[in-house]
A protein has these predicted regions:
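N-terminal glycine-/serine-/threonine-rich phosphate-binding loop
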Residues: 1-46, 55-62
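Conserved small/polar residues in nucleotide/adenosyl-binding loops
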Residues: 178-181
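Phosphate/diphosphate-binding glycine-rich loops and adjacent basic-rich segments that engage nucleotide
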Residues: 123-173
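Internal, active-site/partner-interface "lid" segment
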Residues: 107-123
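Active-site loop-to-helix "anion-binding N-cap" substructures in soluble metabolic enzymes
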Residues: 2-4, 14-17, 21-24, 62-69, ...
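A charged helix-plus-loop insertion that forms the helical arch/lid used to bind
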Residues: 54-81, 127-136
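Short beta-strand segments
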Residues: 9-11, 46-47, 89, 108-113
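Short, active-site-adjacent cap segments at secondary-structure transitions
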Residues: 14-16, 50-54, 115-119
Length: 181
């Protein structure tokens, strides 16, 4: 009998908003994943990266202020960076938890890209909140660069992005290789 595939989705802020919080959250997730593996499941994990991609984007922008010879990192690159380090933390924590239980199964991270419709309605009204809290002055600076900002209920500001509906996962065939019996 083949193992059942279980998909675990770690939603918005499930991994925390700072690197120390993420380390704690990935260890907690690793225990739950190891429980599923012990129960005979093959596990695929999907995760959000909003807080992390915002943090990376902010860090890259701040770095650019003191090192102008470095090129600005577009959001797509920041997203890939966040997938890489989230995947690394999850992969490391899951592998360690499995080994501590005497389970020796491969654990891998796959970075993914999606194809979107460039005319998706989400571009007309961006609403995915990312990054740190901005002052009013910082919000105005972001808007002057062509970025979208929203004022939150508490009077603070944050960057927002469009979140168009994915049409296709570019690496789907690779993902399917890992879920085949």
């Amino acid at each position: 009998m083949s193992e059942k595939i279980t998909v675990v989705a770690l939603g918005h802020r499930a991994l925390g908003t700072t690197l120390p919080e993420q380390k704690i959250a990935t260890k907690k997730a690793a225990k739950a994943v190891a429980d599923l593996v012990e129960a005979g499941n093959r596990v695929v994990i999907s995760h959000s990266n909003g807080p992390q991609v915002g943090m990376i984007h902010t860090a890259m922008n701040e770095f650019g202020k003191t090192h102008p010879d470095y090129t600005f990192a577009p959001m797509s690159v920041c997203s890939a960076m966040s997938q890489g380090y989230i995947g690394y933390d999850l992969q490391t924590a899951i592998r360690a938890e499995l080994i501590s239980r005497g389970i020796y199964k491969p654990v891998a991270t796959i970075l993914t890209q999606v194809v979107i419709d460039p005319y998706d309605d989400a571009f007309a009204e961006p609403e995915k909140i990312i990054g740190r809290v901005l002052t009013e002055e910082e919000a105005e600076t972001e808007e002057s660069k062509g970025n979208f900002v929203t004022k939150l209920a508490d009077g603070t500001y944050k960057r927002i992005l469009a979140a168009p509906k994915p049409q296709k996962i570019v690496e789907l065939e690779t993902c399917l290789l890992y879920t085949s019996p």
